[in-house]
């Protein structure tokens, strides 16, 4: 029975990784094609649906960690996925005013290259039991450039959205109401920005540690 469940797990994770890989490959292709043909102002319109699908599919990774399908700690996975979902739905989907900014293009390209490398790496690992050495190096080295460009784009887009969040009062809840509860999305977004200050360096150091362990292990093998 344990052997059968192991096979089911590997088949499921193989399919999951390659399906999401295909989604991010589509995002990258559409972003680059649109950038070349009509400019960065139109990139979001071209990639909106594929981006939403590919990024929202990452929610399953939290469940994978919770039920033990993968060894990735939820404490590391949750903030990464949470911040991306916040950008995808809370900023880009909700505030069209920022969609034509060039930071959308740098964000999407940084995210998609990162995820194409990551999902194909784990796709090979689950399907074949290993990944090529060059793929391992890419998996644990590409973040050195792509994480800073991605984070810079995220912070920039959140900052650009702040005036529109404040004037629209979208997602804010004012008193009085039946629940006797108030919520200000503008100040919540400022709090999210503040979390980036300690959170980004911490995550970068975490990934540097991952890189050191993974590459050291590959040299020993």
Curated annotation (Swiss-Prot):
It comes from Arabidopsis thaliana (Mouse-ear cress). Keywords: Cytoplasm, Developmental protein, Endoplasmic reticulum, Fatty acid biosynthesis, Fatty acid metabolism, Lipid biosynthesis, Lipid metabolism, Lyase, Membrane, Nucleus, Transmembrane, Transmembrane helix. Pathway: Lipid metabolism; fatty acid biosynthesis. The gene is PAS2. The chain crosses the membrane at residues 12-32, 52-70, 77-95, 101-122, 143-165, 185-204. Residues 33-51, 96-100, 166-184 are lumenal. It is a multi-pass membrane protein. It catalyses: a very-long-chain (3R)-3-hydroxyacyl-CoA = a very-long-chain (2E)-enoyl-CoA + H2O. Catalyzes the third of the four reactions of the long-chain fatty acids elongation cycle. This endoplasmic reticulum-bound enzymatic process, allows the addition of two carbons to the chain of long- and very long-chain fatty acids/VLCFAs per cycle. This enzyme catalyzes the dehydration of the 3-hydroxyacyl-CoA intermediate into trans-2,3-enoyl-CoA, within each cycle of fatty acid elongation. Thereby, it participates in the production of VLCFAs of different chain lengths that are involved in multiple biological processes as precursors of membrane lipids and lipid mediators. Residues 1-11, 71-76, 123-142, 205-221 are cytoplasmic. Belongs to the very long-chain fatty acids dehydratase HACD family. It is found in: Endoplasmic reticulum membrane; Cytoplasm; Nucleus. Changing residue 72 to F: Loss of proliferation control. The keyword Cytoplasm applies. Interacts with CDKA-1; but only with the 'Tyr-15' phosphorylated protein. Interacts with PAS1. Part of the fatty acid elongase complex which contains a beta-ketoacyl-CoA synthase (KCS), a beta-ketoacyl-CoA reductase (KCR), a beta-hydroxyacyl-CoA dehydratase (HCD) and an enoyl-CoA reductase (ECR). Pfam families: PTPLA. This is Very-long-chain (3R)-3-hydroxyacyl-CoA dehydratase PASTICCINO 2.
């Amino acid at each position: 029975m344990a052997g059968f469940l192991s096979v089911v797990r590997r088949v499921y994770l193989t399919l999951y990784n390659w399906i999401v890989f295909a989604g991010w490959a589509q995002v990258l292709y559409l972003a680059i094609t649109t950038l070349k043909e009509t400019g960065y102002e139109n990139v979001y319109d071209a990639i909106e649906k594929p981006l939403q699908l590919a990024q929202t599919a990452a929610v399953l990774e939290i469940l994978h960690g919770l039920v033990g399908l993968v060894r990735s700690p939820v404490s590391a996975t949750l903030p990464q996925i949470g911040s991306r979902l916040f950008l995808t739905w809370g900023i880009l989907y909700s505030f069209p005013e920022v969609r034509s900014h060039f930071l959308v293009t740098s964000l999407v390209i940084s995210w998609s290259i990162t995820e194409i490398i990551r999902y194909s790496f784990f796709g090979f690992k689950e399907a074949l039991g290993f990944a090529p050495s060059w793929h391992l190096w890419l998996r644990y080295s590409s973040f050195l450039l792509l994480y800073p460009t991605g984070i810079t784009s995220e912070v920039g887009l959140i900052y650009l959205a702040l005036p529109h969040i404040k004037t629209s009062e979208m997602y804010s809840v004012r008193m009085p109401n039946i629940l006797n509860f108030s919520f200000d999305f503008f100040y919540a977004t400022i709090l999210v920005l503040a979390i980036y200050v300690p959170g980004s360096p911490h995550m970068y150091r975490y990934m540097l540690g991952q890189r050191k362990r993974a590459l050291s292990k590959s040299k020993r093998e």
